[in-house]
Amino acid sequence: MCDAAAATATTTTTAAVAAAVATTTASVALEATATQPGTTTTTVATASAGTTSPEAAIPTAATATSARNSNSERSARQNCCRLCIAPQTECISIINSYAADKEPLSTKIHNCVGIKVTPQDRLSQQICHACISYLNSWQSFKNRCFSSQAKQRQWLDTNKSKLLNYLDLNSAENGGGGFFDQHLHQQQQHHQHLENELEAEKEKATPTAASTAANILDGIHSLKKRKSLTVYPLPAMPIKDEPIDTDDDYQMKSIDESDDMVDPTMFLERSEHEGDVPLTASDYDYTAQHGVNASSVAASLPPNAVANVAAAGDSKVASCRACSLQFSTRANARRHERNLHPNLFQLSTDSPHNTPITKPTPALAAALEMQRAAAAAATAEANRAAGAAGGNISTQKYRQVVMNAFIKCEGGGYDYDNPEQYRPLLTRDKVEFIEQNDEFLEQYQTMTCRCCNKYFSTYKNFMAHVRKKYPQLPRNLCFNCLKMNDSKALFISHLKKRNCINLFRVLNALRGKTTTVVVPIADDVADDGATGSIPVADAGAGVVAMNSPTVTASGEVVTPGGGSERPEKLRAKELLVNKLYECKLCPKGFRTKHEFRTHVYDKHADVQRKDNNSIQCSFCGLDFADPVDRRRHYNNMDCIVRLRCMTCDAKLETHQRFLDHVYQDHLGGVGGGAVSDNASTTGSGMARSNSMEHSPGKRSLLGALGVGSSAEESRSSSAAPPLTSTPKLAGGNQVGGGGSTSASAAAAAQSSANRDASAPKSQYFSRMPQVCPICGQQYNNYNNVLRHMESKHPNKLPETYKCVRCGLGYPRISYLREHMINVHGVDKNRHSGGFEYIVNADAVKLADGSTPNVYTGRYDYVMKDLMSITNGGTLDDEEEEPGSVAKKMRLDDSSNNSSLVGVASQQKECPICNAVFSNNIGLSNHMRSHYTASNAVNAALAAANRMTPKSLTITATPATDSELGVGGTMSESAPATPANVPPAMANQTPQEQAVFRRSLDQAADRRFRRMRCRICQRRFSSKKSYRYHMLTDHQVQNVQFIKCKLCNAEFAYEKGLKVHLFKVHGKAIKDEMIIKQFECDVCSIVYSSESELQQHKRSVHKLTSASASTSASTSSKIDDDSLMDDGKPTSSDLADLSTLAAGGSTASAPLYWYQCKYCPSNFNTNKKLAIHINSHDEFDSNDYSCKDCGNVYSGRKSLWVHRYKKHPQVPNPAECSLCRKVFFDRQMHDNHTPTCNRKPITSTGAHQQQDGQLHSHHTAKRTIFRHKTGDDDDEEDDDEQQQLEERANSDGNGTTVGVASGSTAAAGTSLKIRIPEVACTICGARFTDQEHFSKHIQKHEQELYVDNPLAAMFDDGPADAGQFQVERQNENGEYACDLCAKTFPQVIALKVHRKWHFRGDSKQNPIDGEATQLTNNNHTTNNNNNNSMHLRELHAVGLMPNQQQQSLNNSCNSSMNHNNNSSSNRSKSMKRKRELKCEYCASTFISNNNLRRHMYELHKHEVSNLPEPPVIVVDDHLTCRRCQLKFDTKELWIEHKLADAKVVRPFCPFQWGCDLCGEYLSRKEKLMNHINNHLKEEVIVPVATKAAIERTAAMESAAADANAAATLSALGEGAETEDQFAEKVEAAGATTTDKLTNPDEEDSDDLDEDSSGDDDDSSGTGDDDDDDDSDDDEDGEGEDEDEEGDGGEGEDEEGVQPPAQLLPQQQHKTDLNLNQDDDDLVEEVISSDDDEDDDGEVESDDDDEDDDDEEDDVEEPEPVGLTVRPLMNGKSKMPPLIVASSDDEDDGVMPIEDIIEEEFDEDADPDPEDAIEEVDEDDLDEGEVEDEPNVVSTASFSESESSTTTTSNSHSHSHSTGERRKKAVDQLNDPGFTCDLCQLCFDSQELLQSHIKSHILNGPKLSTVSAAAAAAAAAATASSKATALLTAAKAKPDSKSAVLANNNNSKTSSKTVAAGATN
C-alpha cells in the first residue's frame, strides 16, 4: 500500500512540475519546503554515492546550470541500490536477475521486505550483491528498506523544492502570478498529507521503526573508510581463504581481529544443531554454559561497573560491547547486540530525553570488567618486561607482550586451576589429536611460530604461516575446544565468540596434577651451565591480575619464591635465521637480505651507488685497501643495513657481530644478560624464550665440516610430541598451560639431561656453523668455508673428494667431476645425477683435531631414487619413520666422540666390509658397490679384500675400539675371516646365514626398485611423483598400481610385478602369463592364432600351405614390451628365404622392401627397418611423429612399435630407375628419387659376371637387389660369386638359395652397386658416406664410458630420450638396449650385446690373411694341415662353405684343383662373413654359440640326435651330496641349493642340473626358479627311477655288442691294424656301456617347461632373449670363472678327477699310433689357452665377438705344423661346456673331437660314476669318427635343447653309425660336397651345410673313451653294409652319407684319436 501511495505522489509531483514551468513562485516553494514530512532530521552520508546531502544542495538562488547539476545527481541516485543505496558499480538489475533459488529478485524482494519493484518505478531498479545475500537474513532488514524508501522520496522532494524555487524566482522576475501557484501549493499539501498518513501506519506496525531509523542514520557523518568487511557503505566481500604468507610483512596489525573478519550478519541463518547452545541463549550466559553464576560475579564488581559499561555503550565506538565486533555505525552495532545477544542487553529509558537505549546486563558488565582488568594486568606486565629489558623494547615487542598476557587472561569463565570438572570433555579422539599435534598447539597458545619466533596478531595470519609446516591440520577446526564446524562461516563466527574452553590447557593441567616425576629447575640450569638466577620477566610473567579475585590466569602461576618453567631449547638454525635487516635510512625492516637489497635499490638508489673503484666507501667513508673487501662491503650494503636479533631485540652493525652475538649470548650457555634479553621477547613465561638448555657450546658448534645432530633431531619433532614438551616446575603451583609432560616424558627428559650434562652439545642440529681450519674464521656452512679458503688460503684447500682412478683430491665435488670428464674422458651426461668417489676422511676432521668415529663425508650428489626404498620402488616422498634421513641426504656425523649412547642406534655397519655409516642411505648406496661386481650372495661370500679398486665407493673412517664399542671398521684391504665369509656371518648358524644372504639380496636389489614411465622412459622414486608425471606430461589420470600379494611392493604395470615375483619371491612365471602371438615373417603383422597367420600368408603373400606352416612354426611369442625375436640382428639384411625355399615357392615378391633413408641398407620387414633406423644418429631424436597418422610419441621405440602394430602396409614394390633399389611402396620410392644421384644401371651391367646364375635369375624373374650394409663389402661379394661359379661348375645347380647366412638370395649379389667405402677400424663396419662414418665413430667414442666403474654404478643417462646411451634402466632395473627391444640384468651384459649390433670383422683380417697364405703355401705338402686350415676358414665364414672348401672337396677326389684353390685363396677377402642361419627357422646369428643355444632352446623337439648329459644322482632328503652337509629343515636345504646353483657350472651345454630331482634346465635362472618351486612341493619326485636307468643301460649294452660284432666281421684288407685296434676299443666300449645309467625316453616330457615359450622376455629373468654369451653374467664371479672353459688346468668344482679306467686305453692308443710330440704340443696349447681364459672376472664378460676373434688372435703366430687353438680356447664368455665344432680351428694334428675330449676329460662330472659312464660312451662315438676319417658322426645333426636329458650317447652313436653305412656306397660314386671336419660327402651344398651344423651341436659331449669306441664303430661301418641296413631306421632320412676318400686321412685321424685318448 505504501508503494502505491508513493507511486501516486510521484505521478502527481511530476505533473505539477510540468504544468508550472513558467508560473511557479518562490512563496510556493518555501511553503512546500515547510510542509515536507518530518524526516528532515535524518542526515544522509552520501560519500558512497559521490554527492552531498540534500540540505546542503538547496541554493538560495539557482541558475539553469544548477538545475542541470541536480538532474545529474538525481540520475546518479536513481541508479544506486534500491535497498541500501550502495553505489551503482556494485549493483545489478533487479528486473532481469534471479536469486540463488531461481526466484526472480523482484519477487524475492517483495516477499521478503514487502517492496514491490516494477519497471515503471521512478526509484532505483538496481540491487547490490550484499543486499541479495541479506534478503532472508533478519527481520530488521525491512526497517532499513523502509528508511531507504523515505530517503529517496526526500531526495525527490528536495529536487522539487529546488525546481519550485527556480520557478518562483523566474515568476518573480517575470511578474507572473497567481492561480497556478496556489493550485500547486494545494497539490503539495495533499501529497504531504498522504505521506504523513503512510508514516503513521508504518509507525503503528513497527513502533520502534522511527527510533531505529534514527539510530541507524545517527553518526553516519563519522563514517570512516576501513579495511574491514563492513556492510555499509562499502560493499560486502566474499570470505577469502588463508593468504599465502609472504614472510616479509612484519608490521604488527591491530589486536582486534575484526579487520580481517566479515560481518556476522552473513552467518545469522543457523540451525539449532550448528551451535553449542540454542539461538536464544546468550553467548555469555554463564549459568547455562559454564555453571558460573553471573549475578554473583556482577555483585563482586565495583558499584560503578554497570554504569561504566553503559557509558561505554554510549561512546562513539560503533562496536558490539559483548564480542567487540566493529560496525560502520553505532546503530548497526546496537542492532547486532539486540539480535545476537538478546540476553546480554536490555532496553532502558534512563536517558536524558527518555529515548530507549540498549544497556548491558550485569552478567555482561562482569565479563567486561574481567577483560578490562586483564588488559590492565597485561599492561602492567608489559611495563615490567620493559623495565627488565632496561627500556630497550620496541613498540612491536611491547604489543606482543601485551597481547600474550591478554590472551592468557581471557579465561572465558573457565577454572583451569581445577580441570577435573572438564574431564568429560576430553574424549579419546580429542586427547589423541592433542598428543599428535602437541607441538603445534603449544605454539597456538601464544600465536607465535617457534621456528622464526614470529608473533601473529590474528588467527588467519598465524595459520597461513604455520600451515607450511603442518599441512595436515584440519580446516574449520577450533584448536581450543576442538569443535569441527560444518562451514567456514560457522567457524569464523565461532572464533569471534572467544569463549570456548581450551582443551589443550585442560589436558596439560590434568597432566600437571598427575605428574609424579618432576625435573627441578635448578638441575636444568645446572646442566646447561647457566647461572641460577631467574629472569625477572620469566618470574613474573605468569602472575596476571592477582589483585582481582575473578580473573583466571591461563599462564603459569608462579609463587614469588618459585622459578619459571624450563624454556625449550632453540636450535642453532632458528637462532641464526631469526634476524631482521633494518634500513638505516628509513624505519623499515626486512626478513631477507634480498628484500633489503631490493628496497635499497628501489627507495635509496641515490644513496647506494655502485662501486666507483675508490678505496673509500661513498656513503660511510670507510677505507678498503683490498678491492675484494670493498666490493663485499658494497654488495652487502654494510653501511646501510643494521641487523636486529629477533630473539633478544639486540641491534648489531655487521653480520659477523650478529653471528658472534648469537654464538656467545644464545648458544654459549653463560651470561645472565642474554637470558634477560631472551626472556623479554617471549613474555608470559611460555616455552619460547631462549633457552640455554641443551645449547651446544661454542667450541663444539664451531667444530668442522658437517658434524651435527641426526636428521630426526634436526627436523621437526612432531613425531614424538611428549619429548618436545617441557617438564614442570619443582614447586606445587603448576597450573595448566602449554608444555607439561607425562611421567614417562619427564623421566626421559631427566635422563637426557643427565646424559647431556657431560656430552658436548653439537648433536641438536645437523647444519652447524663451520670454521676455517687455517685462520679460525667462522661460517655457517661448509661451502662458505671453502669459498673463504679459496680466496684466502688457496694452497691449503682440503682434499675432501678423491678420484677413484688417480687418487687426486679436490675440495668440491664439482671439481672432481670436471677432473673425471677432462682427464679420464668420462661422459659428463653420465654423472648429472650421481657420482662415485672416495671421501678423504682426513680432510673432514673436526676443528678441535678429533676424528669423527663414523663416516662424515658429504654425499651431495646422490639421486633421491637411490635412497633406501624398501617397498618395491614405490615409497612416497614422505619418509617411512620419524627417524628417517634428511631429504638433502647429507651424511653428517650424528654424534661426537663421547656421545656413545645416542649414536649406538644410529650407526649402520656394512655386513660385508664393516664400513660404518650414519644412516640407511649411506649403507644402501655402499651395498650397491658390493652388488656391482657380483650378486648379493657372492658379495656376502666374498671377503672384503676381494673388492677391486674399481668397485670402491665410500671409504669409511677407521675408528678405534674405544670409540665404536665394536670391533672397529675394516678397510677394503682387511683380511677375510678363515671361513671366507663376511665378519657378520662368522658366528651365525646356517639358518641365520641363509636369512642374512636373503637380506643382502634384497638390500642390493633396491637399485631395481624404481618406477619407470613406459612412455618416456623417465624414472621416478615414488608413486606420487609418478602420478604427477603421468598427469602433467602424458595427461593420464587415475594411474593404477599393481600390488604384490606377498609384500607391499607396487608396480606400474604387470611386467614389473612378474619380474619382482621371480627375483624377490621366487615365484615361477607360467607360460599362460605370456601372450602368445604369431608374427608373419614377411610383413611382421602379428596374429593371435596360427590359423589366422597361415590364412594371411596364403591370401596376401601367396605362400603355399607348406611354406605357411613352415613359417608359422617359426613364429615367436612376443611380449608387449619386446617385439624382437630372439637372436635376430638389427643392422644387417635379414631376408627369410628359407621358408620360401622349403615350400618351393618362386613368388616374384622382391626380397628387400624397406629402404633406409640414411644408408644403403634395406630390409624385408618394417620392424627390422625401424630397428635399424633407430641405430642412426641421423634419425631426428626429437621427431617422434608418425608420418601416417600424425600421432606423436615420446621415444623412438614407442614410435616404431606403433608403426609396427598400427600401420602394417601392403607391399607395393617400386624400383628406382637410377640405382635399382626396390622400395616397399611408392611413397618411399618418391622420397628416395630426389636424393638418388647414381647413374642408371641395367640388369645387363658390369655386375653380371655369372652367366649361369644370371640366366637363372632372369628365368625366375626375381627382382632381388642387395645393397650394402655394415656387414657387407665388395670382397665378400666377389668371394660369394666365386663360390657360386664353382658350385655351378661342380653340380650345375644354379638355383640353390639360402647359400649365405640365410639373408642373401640366389643371385642377389650380382646386382650390388660398387660405391667407394670407408671401413671402421674398431668394429669393421663400412660406410659410403663420410658423414655417416663420422657419426659412427662418435658412437664408439661414447661407448668409452662403459669401461668406467662409475658408469657401472650409476645408470642415469642423458636427459634427452633420443640421445645415445647404453645403460638405461627400465622400471624393473634392467638395462635396455637402445638399438633393439632387449633388456639385460647387468650393464656388462648390455655392453656385450651392443657390440653385437656394431660388430665387424676387421680385427680378424690379419688372421685371415695369414691363414690364407699358410694354406696356399702348405696345401700340396700336408693334407692334414690343409684340413686344419680349412677348419679355421670354415669357422671364419661361419657355416657357409667358401671356395677353399669347394677346392678341398675337389682335392679329396683329385689333385687337379690345387692351383684353382690357390687362386681362389688369393682372391679371398680379408673380411669374413659372420651370419649363421638356423635351418629350422628364419633366425640368423652372428656367432656359432648363439646359433647353438638357439637350437638347444627352441628346436629341441625338431632335432632327434642330441648329446645327452649324464644322469644326475639325486641327493637324499635334506642332504647335500656335493658338500656333504645335512640340514634340519627343508627351507635351509633349498636355501643352500639355491646358493650353490648360483655358482655351479653346467653339466653340458645349456644344461644345468637339479640335484634334488635330477632334472636339467637350459638356463641358470630357470634352475634357480625350479629349485625354488621344490620348496612348495611336499615330496620331491626324481625324474628317473633306478629301474629305468638299468633298462636303458641294458639296451645300450646290447646295441654296442651288436655294433662290435659287425665291426669285427666287416674289416677290409687295407686296414688290418685299424681293425685290430678297433676291435679292442669296441670291446672296451661295450664293457663300459653296460654301466650306462640313462633314464627312459618316456621321461622326455617331464621338462616341457623349458620349451621355447620360456625364452620369452616376460619370463622375468630379464635376459632370456639375450643372443650373446653374456646371459649368465649376472650369476656372479664364480660362474664366470667356470664359464671360461678352464678345464684344462684340472680345476674341477666337485673335485672329481677323470676316471682311472681311461688310462689303459689311453696308453694303448699311445703305444699304437700316436706321435707323442704332437700330443704334448696339443696338451700344451690347451693348457696355455686355458690359462688365458682365467685372466679375470672382467674378461669373462666379453661378447662372443671375442669368442671368435680371440681364437684367431691367439693362433696367429703359430706355425703351420702346430696344433691350432682348440674348441673352447678363447671362449671367455661361454659357459664351460658350451662348445661347437664349427668354432674350432685345427691344423690337422687333432680333429675336433679330440679337442673336445681334451676339454672335457679334465672337467669331470660331479658324480664319479656318471663321469665314467659318460666318458666311456663318448669315447666310443669318437672312436668311430676318428677311425674312419672320411665319415662324420651326425649324432646331433639338428639338435636343440632337449629337456629330457635321457637319450644316451650310445643311442646317438647308433644313429650316426647307421647313417654312415647307409650312404657309404652312394658317396663312392658321387663325391659331391665333402665335409672338411670328417670327410663325409654330400650330394648338395645344403646338406653339407646342415651337416656342418651338427658338428656345432655334437661336440660338447664327446670324451676320450667314447671317442675311441666311436672310432672303432666307424671303422666297422666302412665295409659292413648289412649292419648299416640294420640301423638305417634310426638315421635321419634327409642326411646323405658318403664314404672315405683316401687312406692318408684315415691314418692321420687314428693318430689323433690315440693322442686324445692318452690325454
Swiss-Prot record:
One Gene Ontology cellular component: nucleus
Biased composition (Polar residues): 677-693, 1233-1253
SUPFAM superfamilies, sorted: beta-beta-alpha zinc fingers, Glucocorticoid receptor-like (DNA-binding domain)
Chain intervals annotated as zinc finger (C2H2-type): 318-341, 447-469, 581-604, 770-793, 801-824, 908-930, 1011-1034, 1042-1065, 1078-1101, 1154-1176, 1184-1207, 1318-1340, 1375-1397, 1476-1499, 1552-1574, 1873-1895
Compartments, record wording: Nucleus
Residue span, ZAD domain: 79-155
Chain intervals for the UniProt region annotation (Disordered): 178-208, 674-762, 960-991, 1233-1301, 1445-1471, 1627-1865, 1933-1959
Ranges of compositional bias, category Acidic residues: 1271-1283, 1639-1695, 1716-1758, 1782-1829
Biased composition (Basic and acidic residues): 192-205
Keywords: Coiled coil, Metal-binding, Nucleus, Phosphoprotein, Repeat, Zinc, Zinc-finger
Modified residues (Phosphothreonine): T246
Positions of post-translational Phosphoserine modification: S228, S680, S832, S894, S895, S898, S899
Coiled-coil regions listed in the entry: none
Biased composition (Low complexity): 716-727, 741-759, 1445-1467, 1697-1715, 1833-1851, 1942-1952
Basic residues: bias regions: 1255-1267
Mutant lacking the gene: phenotype: Flies exhibit defective responses to environmental stressors, such as heat and the free-radical-generating agent paraquat.
SMART domains: zf-AD, ZnF_C2H2, ZnF_U1
Note: Stress, at both the cellular and systemic levels, contributes to drug- and addiction-related behaviors in mammals. Function of hang suggests that this role may be conserved across evolution.
Function: Required for normal development of ethanol tolerance. Relies on two distinct molecular pathways: a cellular stress pathway defined by hang, and a parallel pathway requiring octopamine.
Name assigned to this protein: Zinc finger protein hangover
Organism this protein belongs to: Drosophila melanogaster
